[in-house]
């Protein structure tokens, strides 16, 4: 069964919904699905409070696909590793296995976190939609969220055709600069020279291993804190 995880705004805790669908060998975008796991049981922690005299912790929300949602396998998501004393994942936003950009835009809720992290586009790499039109959807995601401080993340290597991932990441970087978004490439240490994954860092040439997700969380953590100002 294909399991998908949603991150839903609107409560003090994250609400996680697991939807069951017909079994399939590939997603609608031609990408292999994630290995399946049981439904997640944990919710995000309540918003932490700062001790007297200490700065308020930075909260962030996310919009993404399986790189973030990981079909309930918490150890595979970078969000499991990015928190620190001064930073926490609110559990809000939206992420789903196999989601293309248009689906993310349609489901992005209104948010009030300090920073929005958008890690998106892998499921559109083989799309005939022009790069500029895809970037317009990224902007629409940001507008729907209502968050002022935005961090755009590069997508991981895409071994079926590394050139597609490289081109999308270059377009994201340039667009972020012009739009006033922060940008981070947390996967730079997990690629080899042709732009594909280090073989030890991926389960399938598209998704990182849990250890690779943990490595990617380090630059993401620094970039989120910097984006918060």
Model-derived features with residue positions:
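Active-site segments of SGNH/GDSL-like serine hydrolases
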Residues: 122-123, 142-169
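Oxyanion-hole/transition-state-stabilizing segment in secreted/luminal serine hydrolases
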Residues: 101-135, 155-158
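N-terminal export and membrane-targeting signals
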Residues: 1-16
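Catalytic His-Asp segment of secreted/periplasmic serine-dependent ester chemistry enzymes
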Residues: 13-16, 21-26, 162-229
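Serine-esterase "nucleophile elbow" of acetyl-processing enzymes
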Residues: 26-97, 102-112
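Structural motif
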Residues: 59, 115-117, 149
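Extracytoplasmic/secreted cell-surface and envelope-processing proteins
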Residues: 71, 125-129, 159-166, 193-194
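Active-site-proximal beta-strand/loop segments in catalytic clefts of secreted hydrolases
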Residues: 63-66, 94-97, 119-123, 153-158, ...
């Amino acid at each position: 069964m294909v399991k998908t995880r949603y991150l839903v705004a609107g409560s003090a805790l994250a609400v996680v919904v697991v939807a069951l669908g017909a079994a399939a060998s590939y997603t609608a975008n031609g990408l292999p699905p994630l290995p399946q796991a049981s439904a997640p049981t944990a919710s995000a922690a309540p918003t932490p409070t700062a001790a007297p005299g200490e700065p308020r912790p930075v909260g962030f929300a996310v919009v993404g696909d399986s790189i973030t949602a990981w079909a309930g396998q918490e150890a595979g998501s970078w969000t499991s590793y990015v928190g620190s004393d001064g930073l926490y994942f609110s559990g809000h936003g939206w992420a789903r296995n196999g989601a293309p950009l248009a689906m993310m835009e349609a489901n992005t809720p209104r948010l009030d976190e300090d920073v929005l992290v958008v890690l998106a586009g892998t499921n559109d790499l083989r799309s005939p939609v022009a790069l500029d039109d895809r970037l317009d959807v990224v902007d629409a995601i940001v507008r729907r969220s209502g968050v002022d401080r935005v961090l755009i993340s590069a997508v991981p290597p895409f071994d079926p055709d590394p050139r597609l991932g490289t081109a999308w990441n270059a377009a994201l970087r340039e667009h972020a600069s012009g739009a006033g978004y922060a940008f981070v490439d947390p996967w730079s240490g997990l690629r080899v020279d042709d732009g594909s994954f280090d073989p030890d860092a991926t389960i399938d040439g598209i998704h990182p291993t849990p250890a690779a997700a943990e490595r990617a969380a380090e630059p993401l953590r620094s970039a989120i804190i910097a984006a918060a100002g």
